[in-house]
């Protein structure tokens, strides 16, 4: 977990693997936690040794009940990217420490989270003005370049956008003290990404002073430590003579699945699978 080029505090993404053993291990190492739901917050606090200040509620579109529960649990740091969220927070958790999630270029990632989260820079002044009007505290900026990012330049571009958002914050009367660089880290490219981030931060935030840097790695922590086993509950053979399927494709092993838009699976057979003809037709 120690990298020379990493200058951020880690907040592990609980959604990636909420196994109690993993959470206890990370908590013991002093890691913070990125939670996206009531259940994830409860799992972390149930460990007994994690102060609520070590949690960021990194979900920009929360149910009112979620915000109310965060307030009761002492979780103050949370993200937003829209006006509706500001109204909800003002009603149910006015003492929250808000982090503005901005939209970045995530086109060079396997999972483009910008399809659902992040405020474009053009919307930032209006959001900050509304936050001021409602008397809310905005402490910083967050972004996410997408899960499975495969181009380090995405981080440099995101830092440049964050700098612009910081300047907009100053113009709106805020002094931001937090920069959350999100996740999207891969083990094979972590050092390269950290180097790009470090250089970009030095360039765009030479006056960073007391700005706190945090990151939200998820699969980076656990992808090599776990495998997910699942049963094959049905099989279907290719239709003979299907013009859309070549002979080579028909003979190649394949898997039919769904609900994988936000997952990056690698399939491997764990045991011998009987030929399709061995299955009863009943």
Q: Which residue ranges define each predicted feature?
A:
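C-terminal active-site-proximal or functional interface alpha/beta core segments in diverse enzymes
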Residues: 151-282
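Active-site-proximal beta-alpha core segment in soluble small-molecule metabolic enzymes
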Residues: 9-178, 190-191, 200, 204-205, ...
């Amino acid at each position: 977990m120690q990298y020379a080029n990493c200058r951020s505090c880690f907040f592990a993404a609980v959604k990636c693997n909420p196994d109690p053993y993993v959470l206890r291990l990370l908590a013991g190492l002093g890691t913070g936690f990125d939670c996206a739901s009531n259940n994830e917050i409860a799992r972390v606090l149930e460990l007994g040794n994690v102060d609520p200040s070590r949690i960021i509620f990194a979900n920009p579109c929360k149910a009112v009940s979620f915000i109310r529960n965060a307030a009761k649990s002492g979780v103050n740091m949370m993200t937003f990217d829209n006006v509706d969220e500001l109204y909800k927070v003002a009603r149910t958790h006015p003492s929250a420490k808000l982090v503005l999630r901005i939209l970045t270029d995530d086109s060079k990632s396997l999972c483009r989270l910008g399809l659902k989260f992040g405020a474009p820079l053009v919307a930032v002044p209006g959001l900050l003005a509304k936050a001021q009007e409602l008397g809310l505290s905005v402490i910083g900026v967050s972004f996410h370049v997408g899960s499975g990012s495969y181009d380090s330049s995405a981080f440099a571009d995101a830092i440049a956008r964050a700098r612009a958002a910081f300047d907009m914050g100053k113009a709106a009367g805020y002094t931001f003290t937090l920069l959350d660089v999100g996740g999207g880290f891969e083990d094979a490219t972590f050092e390269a990404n950290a180097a790009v981030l470090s250089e970009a931060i030095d360039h765009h935030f030479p006056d960073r002073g007391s700005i706190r840097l945090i990151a939200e790695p998820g699969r980076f922590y656990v992808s090599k430590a776990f495998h997910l086993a699942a049963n094959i509950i049905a099989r279907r053979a290719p239709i003979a003579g299907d013009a859309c399927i070549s002979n080579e494709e028909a003979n190649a092993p394949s898997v039919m699945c769904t609900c994988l838009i936000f997952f990056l699976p690698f399939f491997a057979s764990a045991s011998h699978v009987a030929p399709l003809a061995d299955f009863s037709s009943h």
